[in-house]
Amino acid sequence: RYGWRDPNWRGNVGILIRFAHPDGRQRHVQIDVGKTFREAVLRWYTAHGVGTLDAVILTHDHADAIFGMDDLRSVQRWDPKTKMSAETTRVYSDRRTLATLRKAFPYLFPTPAVERPGGFAEGRKLARDCPDCSSVGEVTVAVNGSANGAGANGANGASNGANGGATNGGGPPAAARSDSLEKFVALEQACGCAPTSPVQRYVASLQWLPFPEETTAPFEVDGLVVHPLPVLHGKDYVSYGFGFGGEGRRVVYLSDYTALLPATEALLARWTAAPDAIDLLVLDALSWDKPSPVHANVEISIALARRLAPRKALLVGMGHDFEHRAANRVLRRLRAEGLDIQLARDGELVEVPLAAGEVCMSVDS
């Protein structure tokens, strides 16, 4: 009887946030799109009546958070007349994750003169698509979509790095950063041996938006105020949790952590002081009590939940040695001390009331 409807069938961790917008249309924001994102869409988006996404927020640059990026094209609004995405999906991340995405998914950062995002297009063949290419130039592209350079060996573009810039030989496109968050650039190599060869492909139409780093300064997604929560994911790696919701109805999501950083500790201390309160707390729990260098376990997360005193807590990211029902029977004993904490299950729907309506979240464990 074991199968995807069984609570022990677990995909990569993520949550889908659904909330009412004043314009009357519901918004859908996904936190993390890991290796099993496509499965989650087929199973749980359909079950919860979700057809498209408005935005994606990424916690970090590991495979379990970003390797489903290619499948975002399947959850974008489609214009049958133009055969292109009708809208651009916003993607919020830190700079490191953005740089990793450029290397892992260079085709999701298309050059306007070469490819058009969100639909089929023709343009100059790219060096990465040409096994015989030995003469390449660089096309520099701003994240906002404006071209800053010209094609292969062109007058306005650097030829083989001669005019400087961030290059990496024949490898994947390098990433460079200017002084402004709005001026991240990607360097694309254009094919020099067949400049008129057509490119035809359909890729997701995405807008890349870095959020404030190592601080809890908020950013806004269609009226939903989101606070980044920097945490350690191992001794030397910073990942991000996220917090949102109004006073007394906070939601805190910490999917990959070993320790909280000072800025996060300070904000959560304010959110646990009356009249404020955490309504829902989602915490990492790789194992029951075994130590891990990069993840919290159940014992660590129970201790944090006791300190933050949420109305409800869910554990995610469990290894497959957990038996869902048996573990939750043990955890229910903590209700005697006023702590409601359980293992989450894939597709679980949690309703959280907010000042402006309701947020419904589907949790993948």
Write out the residue ranges for each language-model feature.
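Binuclear metal-dependent hydrolase catalytic cores
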Residues: 1-252, 258-263, 324-364
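Binuclear metal-ion centers of metallo-dependent hydrolases, dominated by the metallo-beta-lactamase
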Residues: 261-365
